């Protein structure tokens, strides 16, 4: 059973610093993120937004500071104390990470359905029929044509690829999703549609998100 307390932060960051050259990146960042809350990180290109997301999600360990996450089993835990295996488990189950370029977050040569089902298989899903059904449900949630379930993402438009990547990340019902400028590479009209879809999904699923 989850120990999540709605009055306790899901994520607590204190004094976080991470740079890529000793100068540029993020410096002394502190914030709390509560269940169901959305935090938008705003800044110019190269200002350190992606670096911050990588440090908070422990894809790149910070140079200083701490990141604590409210795990289901132990409550707030400092990510620095977790093993690589435990961090990988969190990334597969409780977290999602939507990358700016959808091609970096998808397997481009396997089917759309397999991309979604693969994440379910990583947490124990094995029944082919059930996996396919859930994948189809998420295709429809993301306003993707169910008839494209067996098509490879390489044949999709950029906007479709991004929606597929989001489905792949949300299918395991994570509590926290990191989104690294998910609309930056899309046309303005596609951006608006995707942002509206994201707003509805975050509200419907009660996700916490950093965008």
Locate each region found by the language model.
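ABC ATPase NBD coupling module
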Residues: 75-96, 122
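Conserved ABC ATPase "signature" region
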Residues: 130-147
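The feature captures the beta-strand-to-loop junction immediately N-terminal to the Walker
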Residues: 42-44
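Conserved ABC ATPase signature
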Residues: 152-156, 160
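Helix-to-loop junction immediately C-terminal to a conserved catalytic motif
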Residues: 57
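Conserved ABC transporter NBD signature motif
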Residues: 65-78
């Amino acid at each position: 059973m989850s120990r999540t307390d709605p009055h306790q932060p899901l994520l607590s960051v204190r004094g976080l610093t991470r740079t890529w050259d000793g100068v540029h990146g993020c410096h002394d960042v502190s914030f709390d993120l509560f269940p169901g809350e959305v935090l938008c990180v705003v800044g110019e290109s190269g200002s350190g937004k992606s670096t911050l997301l990588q440090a908070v999600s422990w894809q790149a360990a910070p140079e200083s500071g701490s990141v604590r996450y409210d795990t289901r089993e132990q409550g707030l835990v400092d990510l620095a104390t977790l093993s690589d295996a435990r961090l990988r488990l969190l990334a597969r189950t409780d977290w999602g990470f939507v990358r700016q370029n959808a091609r970096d977050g998808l397997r481009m040569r396997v089917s759309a359905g397999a991309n979604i089902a693969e994440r379910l298989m990583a947490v124990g899903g094995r029944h082919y029929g059930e996996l396919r059904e859930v994948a189809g449900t998420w295709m429809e949630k993301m306003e993707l044509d169910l008839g494209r379930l067996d098509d490879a993402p390489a044949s999709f438009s950029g906007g479709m690829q991004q929606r597929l990547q989001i489905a792949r990340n949300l299918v395991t019902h994570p509590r926290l999703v990191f989104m690294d400028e998910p609309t930056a590479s899309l046309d303005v009209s596609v951006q608006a549609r995707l942002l509206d879809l994201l707003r509805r999904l975050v509200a419907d699923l009660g996700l916490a998100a950093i965008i």
